[in-house]
Amino acid sequence: TAALDRIKQAGIVGMGGASFPAHVKLNPPEDKDIEYVLVNAAECEPYLTVDERTMKETPEKLIDGLAIVLKISGAYGIIALEDNKAYLKPVLEEQILKCGYTDDMEVILVKTKYPQGSEKFIVSSCLGVEIPSGKLPADAGVIISNVGTICAISDAFRLGKPLIERSLTISGGAVETPCNLKVPVGTMISDLSPEYFSLKENSAVKIISGGPMMGFAMPDMNFPVAKGTSGITFLTKDETYLVDEDQCI
């Protein structure tokens, strides 16, 4: 369809880490009957707050993007929030009411725990449906998308803007002032410091692209922001379990 083509041309992918093309996810095989589009707003990864900040600052963009996806899929929309972000529920519900989408989508609070945001957990928590081993959410009639992805779809349709920038969290005990930044995709992390964030002197012993549970350890800051980079975490020695190396024999 033209809508899926627009998403494809905008280069929109899953922004929660997997970077799976959004136009493919929104066009499942004909034998998959999609009943729900589930926006994974749990953000259970420690240190990361980029989705929370996005929902707080631009709730209208999330609701608009979800409405577009629902029109494409013909499904019902659910936004899943962890209950430590319960203050956002009335904010999003007000926007849903304002836009006239109360029959099309709702906001559900789920328990704050890790790994609440994983696909099978979030589907089970929201819908009471178990996804069998080896199966995908689409097999259970569900499409799961990330907050950033849904907002990027809104930008593509309303502004004609491709996915050329993203927001990410800079956090961890080694960061002087943890923050969320919006930067062009491809920006080197080393180019962001010290102008946009600074580290406590000689305190960062571990640099992670992403969060501490699902992220990847990096040797230094000479790597770029990708479409799936949700944050950069700088950990101190107290926050990591590092043991002294010794001879293995």
What are these regions (language model features)?
Residues 34, 165-167, 229-230:
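Short glycine-rich loop/turn motifs
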Residues 188-189, 212-216, 239-240:
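Short, catalytically relevant binding-site loops at active-site mouths
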